[in-house]
Amino acid sequence: EKGPSSLDTLHFLMDLKERVNCWFVLGNCDYWYDEHNHSMPCRDWYVKDYLLTNANGNGPGLLQQMCDAAGIVVDKDFDIENYYRTLGAMFPREFEFLASMPQVIETDSYIFVHGGLPKGDPGHWDGWDCMKNDDFMGQGRKFDKWVIVGHWPVQLYGGDVCCANPIIDRDSHIISIDGGCVLKDDGQLNALVIPHDGSDDFGLIAYDPFPVRRVKSAQAGGGPSTYIRWGDNQVEILSRGGEFSRVRHVRTGYELDILTKYLYGESGVVRCNDCTDYVLPLEAGDEVSVIETTSRGYLVKHEGVSGWYYGELE
């Protein structure tokens, strides 16, 4: 739901399920299986709003891609009944596949769930609370089995340094793996590698779409820095520039330069995309993913950590 290829991705997973032994858990952005043939006033409003707002600004989402494939023109007057009939007839396998996904998968050693496990008796859990369970690692919960979750980008748990790698909390037995792929400008897709021998020596395979280059000269990192992120991203513009603007983070009073294109909402409350002024410690020969190329230097990512490099790249 956070990119232009949701329908293609769904078809890829359906094909993968036919060929190999794999399992999927349902997430809150995948919960469309009962939206195609059950007209209800509240649901009708939600579907229309979702389509007309381009998946809340993250689209086109899965339903819009289905509408495009079916030739349905989405506007404020589009026929919701025709929408249900057409998509239900054209994509029955897709909706059935989504409906077949469990919200929780439990094994002898692991529990897999998109958002997190609700509190209380599992017999009374609501599926939606398993799929959308914000800030699960911040709830102070502890488990006997490893609980592996996504949903809440790991960057939101960090401090003044932005890291997209999974967080493995060995005290609570929670692993959060959402690297903010597509949702974050510097996000990545994380795959947690679980050892066959049942040990806790977890591995990581990560992907991002950025070009990879090599550092030519070493750079000392550190120094004062901050990481402004979603949920706490209100800023005051001190001076505006064409490429960079000087801003003050409203909650902390911290001042930094950020890319002007990261500012939004300037007619009222001004906010910014996730940004940092962290200077990465790097050695000559280190490989980095280049997120932004600017007149001052490069916003890069090295081993999952985002920050600035002010030297030359090969």
Task: Map each language-model feature to its residues.
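Acidic, His/Gly-enriched loop-helix segments that form or flank divalent-metal centers
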Residues: 73-174, 181-185, 197, 202-207, ...
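SH3/SH3-like beta-barrel superfamily modules
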Residues: 230-258, 281-314
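Conserved strand-to-helix beginnings and helix N-cap segments that scaffold or border functional pockets
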Residues: 3-7, 159-160, 187-189
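C-terminal functional module detector
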Residues: 194-231, 240
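Short, basic/aromatic beta-hairpin or loop at an interaction surface
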Residues: 205-216, 252-269
